[in-house]
């Protein structure tokens, strides 16, 4: 099954890749490596601090949306072919939280979960949250 077939099976439509917000490139390929610039939540994501203004569930969904944006950017960088991804290497997740919020990994699971759902074992990665 191709990655596009898997996306269809899951009922996932990738968003349009976002464009850089400043003086940088969105992605860079060198050799067989693809680097993707930092990706934040979409405009539809709730605003505020997780644990104060934003629920854990809403933050998880925002992180999931970030994962979909990463996949959309990878698809653009790889000439439309996500099957060229051999393996995801690392996710670095940053979460804006209330001072007493300690469940950062549960938020970033949103991104990790969607990468594994779509890419299978190729989506498993190291992570900092």
Can you annotate each of these PLM segments?
Residues 1-129:
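Short, polar/acidic, helix-capping and beta-turn segments at strand->helix junctions
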């Amino acid at each position: 099954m191709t990655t596009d077939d898997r996306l269809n099976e899951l009922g996932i439509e990738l968003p349009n890749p976002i464009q850089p917000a400043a003086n940088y490139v969105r992605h860079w390929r060198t050799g067989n490596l693809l680097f993707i610039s930092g990706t934040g939540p979409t405009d539809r994501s709730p605003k505020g601090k997780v644990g104060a203004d934003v629920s854990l569930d809403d933050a998880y969904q925002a992180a999931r949306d970030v994962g979909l944006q990463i996949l959309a950017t990878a698809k653009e960088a790889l000439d439309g072919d996500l099957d060229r991804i051999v393996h995801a290497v690392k996710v670095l997740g940053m979460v804006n939280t209330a001072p007493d919020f300690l469940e950062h990994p549960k938020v970033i699971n949103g991104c990790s979960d969607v990468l594994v759902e779509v890419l299978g074992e190729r989506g498993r990665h190291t992570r900092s949250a």
